[in-house]
């Protein structure tokens, strides 16, 4: 029996890179490292909104996992699958959380120089005394529970909240991927629309409620933004997109020029959506413009890239872009501690230092990713060698 050819979409590696860079630039901006760009009114919304927010990672992951588990007969043990996926990123999350904790202890200590050996104890005690629930915060981040109760602790390595919601997504992946194969095309299109309902209701609740039990609007927004059960529907939307793609509903994108035109239109729509949010609108409406609407646009942009045609898709398929893109979730986890440390070394608010920092983050991440690939190939070759004896 001939083995089925696996689904592979090279341009999506470049999409990962684009989304990752946008998130890193967002946090550079929030740390005041991009103040020199403040006069560029047509660029800053891309960074500050951002144009490609965390939701794109969920749509992309849902699509890719649906493609990997496209065999309806494949049985996937849920618990091993969940922990296998999380373990690939948790080790890095753990070390970055510890690093960020130590960096914040030093920052809050008031020391302006690296403490000598005899000063370490005093520096540590002074920093802890000025932090809010430091040990509880560390525990919440290490156990991936901070995103559930973010108001109970400080934010350490904040982007790690996504690991919690991905853990929930992975829990339903085996079941939902098998269930999708049993559904008719009509049901798939119904799902295409109805999966947005929870996010819209969440936006309405956000806009119609007061600050609830939160101390401030910002604390409330952070909770609504990282709430894992809502993020799962973005992931499922990505899975539904793959099934619709496999059923041939997007084959028209394979025609000459159609893919390129579609990519241009979707990028223009994503950019235009950034200007829909306005201070005078109800917060729930702005939340919808920032969370629900982009998910649809991200999904359609993703679909337009799949045939590999068009200028954007061809750029995303360049070897070096794909190589860096495959490692792009590592910058997502490591950039905040590195930005915090960099501010203690130099002034990040200048173009040269911004570029150098980005080069450092993505070089380290790519080398780490390539090392893991090399180690995996080496272990596989050794296993094959031993089995051949």
Task: Please state what every model-predicted region is.
Residues 1-211, 311, 327-328, 345-389:
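Membrane-cytosol interface segments of multi-pass membrane proteins
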Residues 11, 51-52, 158-166, 224-239, ...:
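Membrane-interface micro-motifs in multi-pass membrane enzymes
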Residues 40-47, 216-226, 283-291, 349-354:
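Non-cytosolic membrane-interface motifs at loop->transmembrane helix junctions
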Residues 79-83, 135, 221, 233, ...:
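Alpha-helical membrane-protein architecture signal
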Residues 171, 178, 236-251:
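Internal transmembrane alpha-helix with an interfacial aromatic "cap," most often the third helix
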Residues 183-192, 251-262:
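Membrane-interfacial entry segments at the cytosolic side of transmembrane helices
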Residues 194-204, 215-233, 239:
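Loop-centered beta-sheet repeat module
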Residues 235, 259-375:
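Alpha-helical transmembrane segments of multi-pass integral membrane proteins
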């Amino acid at each position: 029996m001939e083995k089925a050819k696996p689904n592979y979409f090279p341009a999506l590696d470049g999409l990962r890179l684009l989304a990752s860079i946008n998130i890193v630039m967002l946090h550079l901006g929030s740390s005041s490292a991009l103040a020199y760009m403040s006069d560029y009114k047509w660029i800053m919304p891309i960074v500050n909104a951002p144009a490609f927010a965390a939701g794109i990672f969920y749509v992309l992951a849902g699509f890719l996992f649906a493609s990997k588990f496209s065999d309806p007969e494949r049985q996937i043990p849920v618990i091993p699958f969940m922990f296998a996926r999380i373990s690939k990123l948790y080790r890095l999350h753990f070390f970055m959380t510890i690093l960020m904790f130590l960096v914040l202890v030093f920052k809050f200590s008031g020391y302006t120089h690296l403490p000598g050996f005899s000063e370490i104890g005093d520096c540590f005690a002074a920093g802890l005394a000025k932090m809010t629930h430091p040990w509880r915060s560390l525990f919440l981040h290490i156990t991936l529970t901070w995103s559930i109760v973010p108001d109970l602790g400080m934010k350490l390595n904040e982007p790690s909240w996504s690991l919690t919601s991905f853990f929930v997504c992975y829990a339903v992946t085996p079941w939902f991927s098998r269930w999708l194969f049993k559904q008719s095309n009509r049901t798939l299109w119904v799902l295409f629309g109805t999966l947005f309902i929870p996010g819209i209701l969440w936006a309405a609740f956000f806009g119609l409620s007061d600050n609830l039990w939160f101390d401030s609007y910002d604390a409330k927004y952070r909770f609504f933004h990282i709430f894992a059960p809502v993020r799962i529907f973005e992931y499922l939307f990505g899975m539904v997109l793959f099934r619709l793609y496999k059923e041939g509903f997007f084959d028209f994108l394979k025609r000459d020029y159609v893919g390129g035109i579609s990519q241009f239109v979707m990028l223009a729509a994503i950019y235009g959506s950034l200007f829909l949010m306005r201070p005078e609108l109800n917060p729930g409406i702005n939340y919808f413009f920032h969370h629900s609407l982009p998910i649809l646009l991200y999904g359609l942009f993703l679909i337009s890239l799949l045939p590999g045609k068009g200028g954007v898709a061809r750029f995303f398929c360049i070897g070096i872009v794909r190589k860096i893109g495959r490692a792009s979730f590592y910058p997502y986890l490591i950039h905040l501690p590195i930005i915090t440390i960099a501010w203690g070394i130099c002034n990040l608010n200048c173009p040269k230092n911004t570029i150098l920092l980005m080069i450092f983050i993505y070089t380290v991440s790519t080398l780490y990713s390539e090392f893991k690939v090399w180690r995996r190939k080496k272990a596989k070759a050794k296993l094959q060698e031993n089995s051949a004896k």
